[in-house]
């Protein structure tokens, strides 16, 4: 883990490594949190389900959050979400707080896309980044996932559709902090195809 961590940090020119922790959790995931000094947490499930190239993308993704200063906002979002649950019985206060939380979630979904780019830059392997997103979509098991079908789903999601599709997308994403894996794959593919990844 430390070797992959230092490789990702080197690729992103991270001069001072943050602390890295492994949390016991069977789910695939990681996070970068903290206020004054951010740190990274990777789940044990991530270590079990990913190969080194995919892990480098995850760690690069979290380092991207760190480099962009996202950890402070992530921590604020977590705190405000807890507060919103506690004051939900207050009509006016909860509406205002829920509005702030909704805006932070929308911002966070955009931050996830920029962190995905950092993960791709750290990993230097678009196919590993795609496998990672497929594992996020399918729970880690790629034996039942068709790459072509997944990319078609990403393209279909990206194309959008009519007003009804837009409303469905809005409802699907309203309470999420992360875009759907297919949407993330579409954005990543667009970035790679544009040539910006190569620069």
Task: Please identify what each model-predicted range represents.
Residues 1-33, 102, 108, 140-141, ...:
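Hydrophobic or amphipathic, alpha-helical segments that drive membrane association/targeting
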Residues 1-72:
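Peri-catalytic and regulatory segments of divalent metal-dependent proteins
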Residues 2, 8-14, 92-160:
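Short helix/loop segments within enzyme catalytic domains
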Residues 43, 103, 172:
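Conserved short-loop catalytic and cofactor-binding motifs
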Residues 49-54, 58, 71, 75, ...:
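Charged, alpha-helix-enriched surfaces in structured cytosolic catalytic cores
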Residues 70-101:
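Post-HEXXH active-site segment of zinc metalloproteases
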Residues 78-85, 101, 120, 131-135, ...:
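Generic alpha-helical structural context detector
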Residues 132-199:
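Pan-zinc metallopeptidase signature
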């Amino acid at each position: 883990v430390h070797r992959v961590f230092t490789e990702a940090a080197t690729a992103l020119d991270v001069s001072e490594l943050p602390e890295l922790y492994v949390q016991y959790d069977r789910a695939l995931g990681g996070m970068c949190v903290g206020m004054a000094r951010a740190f990274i947490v990777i789940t044990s499930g991530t270590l079990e389900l990913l190969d080194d190239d995919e892990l480098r993308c995850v760690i690069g993704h979290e380092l991207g959050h760190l480099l962009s200063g996202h950890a402070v906002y992530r921590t604020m979002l977590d705190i405000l979400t807890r507060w919103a649950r506690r004051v939900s019985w207050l009509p006016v206060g909860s509406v205002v707080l829920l509005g702030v939380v909704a805006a932070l979630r929308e911002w966070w979904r955009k931050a996830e896309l920029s962190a995905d780019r950092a993960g791709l830059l750290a990993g230097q392997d678009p196919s590993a980044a795609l496998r990672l997103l497929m594992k996020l979509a399918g729970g880690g098991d790629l034996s039942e996932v068709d790459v072509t079908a997944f990319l078609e789903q990403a393209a279909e999601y990206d194309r959008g559709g009519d007003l009804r599709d837009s409303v469905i997308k809005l409802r699907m994403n309203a309470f999420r902090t992360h875009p759907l894996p297919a949407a993330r794959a579409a954005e990543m593919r667009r970035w790679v195809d544009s040539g910006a990844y190569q620069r």
